C-alpha cells in the first residue's frame, strides 16, 4: 500500500474489526483504554496529545487520549470515550467506534486496549490543563508509514523489550503510542 495516498475509504475498507481478547488478562493487571481518533477527511488525520509536564507518569509524552477503566465504565470502549471527553473534549456521541486492536501490556502494569474511532473534522478540541499540554493532528498516511519508526531495544531487570521512536514536527512519538500506531498500520496491511 502506498502510504501517501491513503484516503478514509481506503483505511475503512482495510480495517477489519477485532474483538478484545477475553482471557488474555494476567493476574494483577489493571485495565486501561485509549482512543485512536481518526479525523474524518478525504486525507484523514490522526489526533494525538502531548501529556502535561506536571503529571507523575509519562509527563510530556505524546499519547492517545485514554486512561484507566473505572468501576463506572461499562466497557473498555466506554472508558476510552470517557477519557477522550475528559482530556480533549471529544463528545462520546461524536465518535464512530469501528473496532479495537489487541490489548497491549504497559510497563506500568496496565493492559491497554486501543479503541479505533472516527471523529468529525470540525470538533473544537479543548485540552484539559491538568492532563494535556497540546493537541495536534498528524496526517494518517504519514503516521502509518512504518519506515518512519526506528527500533530501540531496552534492557531492564534482565529483560529486553523493543520500543519504537519517531518525530513528527516538534513532537517525539515513541513507546506505547508508536507501538500502537505501528500495530494499526500492520492491521490494515501496511508492509514493514
UniProtKB/Swiss-Prot annotation:
PROSITE patterns the UniProt entry points to? NUDIX (PS51462), NUDIX_COA (PS01293)
Pinpoint motif Nudix box by residue range. Answer: 67-89
Name the EC number(s): 3.6.1.-
What keywords were assigned to this record? Hydrolase, Magnesium, Manganese, Metal-binding
Q: What class of enzyme is it?
A: hydrolase
- The positions annotated for binding Mg(2+) are 83, 87
- What GO terms in the biological process aspect are recorded for it? nucleoside diphosphate metabolic process
Q: Spell out the CDD domains in the cross-references.
A: NUDIX_CoAse_Nudt7
Q: In this protein, which residues make up the domain named Nudix hydrolase? A: 29-160
Q: Name one GO molecular function term.
A: coenzyme A diphosphatase activity
Q: Output the InterPro entries linked to this UniProt entry.
A: CoAse, NUDIX_hydrolase-like_dom_sf, NUDIX_hydrolase_dom, NUDIX_hydrolase_NudL_CS, Nudix_NudL
Required co-factor? Mn(2+); Mg(2+)
Question: According to its UniProt entry, what is the function of this protein?
Answer: Probably mediates the hydrolysis of some nucleoside diphosphate derivatives.
| Family membership noted in the UniProt record | Belongs to the Nudix hydrolase family. PCD1 subfamily.
Provide the protein name.
Uncharacterized Nudix hydrolase NudL
Q: Which organism is it from?
A: Shigella flexneri serotype 5b (strain 8401)
